């Protein structure tokens, strides 16, 4: 499974090198524009890919035909907050990968060169999930505010991070100390 292979390359990042998770097959993947030529990844899976590539700082090489992008795909690849994470994340690593309520999840964090921390939560299972993550798991502590990078939703001084995830979905956050 491609997601599992990419989760395993987490140790490839370091000074002067980073993991290359390969191209992002988004939007129309051939120049013949019909429904049969679009990526087979769901919108949630595409968000998961962009989130993982960005927190790892893997090169963002698109494997779709840019001139045929729909609004979702264009917003996906031009999200300024996700692109900032891609540019500024450092020391990214998987904190844990575990089963919660019968569904496998992964938690990644990275420092932000401009201050604060990036957090990405992934649902690796085939069912939607709602989980709660203690701040200590995020390797950050009290006195933080955050923003979910895909929705813009604000998270103010949480004691834990409550996350609703679609099957194969992801959420990305930026936290700063007050």
Q: Where are these predicted regions, by residue range?
A:
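Solvent-exposed beta-hairpin/edge-strand motifs
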Residues: 136-152
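Single conserved hydrophobic/aromatic residue that forms the stacking wall/gate
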Residues: 1-9
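Surface-exposed coil/turn segments at beta-strand junctions on protein surfaces, enriched
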Residues: 112, 126, 156, 165-166
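Aromatic- and carboxylate-lined catalytic core of secreted/periplasmic carbohydrate-active enzymes
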Residues: 13-15, 20, 24-31, 35, ...
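Short, glycine-/Ser/Thr-/acidic-enriched flexible segments
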Residues: 31, 60, 67, 114, ...
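Carbohydrate-binding surface patches
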Residues: 53-56, 61-63, 100-140
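C-terminal beta-strand-rich structural cap/linker in extracellular carbohydrate-active enzymes
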Residues: 157-178
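Hydrophobic, well-ordered secondary-structure elements that form the walls
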Residues: 119, 146, 168
């Amino acid at each position: 499974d491609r997601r599992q292979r990419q989760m395993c390359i987490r140790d490839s990042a370091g000074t002067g090198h980073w993991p290359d998770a390969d191209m992002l097959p988004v939007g129309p993947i051939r120049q013949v524009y019909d429904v049969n030529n679009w990526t087979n990844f769901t919108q949630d899976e595409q968000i998961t890919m962009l989130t993982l590539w960005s927190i790892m700082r893997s090169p963002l090489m698109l494997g779709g035909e840019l001139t045929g992008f729909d609004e979702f795909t264009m917003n996906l690849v031009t999200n300024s907050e996700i692109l900032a994470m891609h540019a500024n994340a450092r020391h990214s690593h998987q904190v844990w990968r575990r089963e919660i309520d019968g569904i496998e999840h992964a938690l990644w964090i990275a420092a932000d060169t401009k201050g604060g921390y990036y957090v990405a939560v992934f649902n690796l299972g085939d069912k939607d999930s709602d989980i709660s993550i203690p701040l200590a798991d995020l390797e950050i502590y009290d006195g933080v505010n955050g923003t979910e990078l895909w929705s813009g939703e604000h998270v103010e001084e949480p004691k834990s991070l409550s996350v609703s995830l679609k099957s194969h979905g992801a959420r990305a956050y930026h936290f700063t100390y007050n």
